[in-house]
């Protein structure tokens, strides 16, 4: 006799799969908040109830560190004018790196028109 998976089994597998995929996208971040006075309350106020706080460091200089789940870095786009003879691909990348912290640039060409476009964390 062949077993037919029930709808509940399929839904359960889908939920488990979605949870695992979502966990792999999340990263662990740390935020140092200075001295330990009210560390747990400050962490939870800034990063939500699921964060963890700890105080560590040398005696007399304990510092508050919050550990929390953070998502992938969001990328923004910007433009820095035209690409061409005066500014090639390397020039565009260099200009984007100078203008936007962590930025990278590339020349996007459509027909005879070429723009310097930047991607950077925001």
Swiss-Prot record:
Major localisation: secreted
Disulphide-bonded residues: 29-70, 36-55, 39-64, 43-66, 76-122, 87-107, 92-116, 96-118
Cellular compartments annotated: Secreted
UniProt KW Signal keyword: yes
Record keywords: Antimicrobial, Disulfide bond, Fungicide, Plant defense, Secreted, Signal
Superkingdom of origin: Eukaryota
Swiss-Prot/TrEMBL GO biological process terms: defense response; defense response to fungus; killing of cells of another organism
Cellular-component GO terms for this entry: extracellular region
Signal peptide positions on this chain: 1-26
Family membership: Belongs to the DEFL family.
Function, as annotated: Confers broad-spectrum resistance to pathogens.
Protein name: Defensin-like protein 181
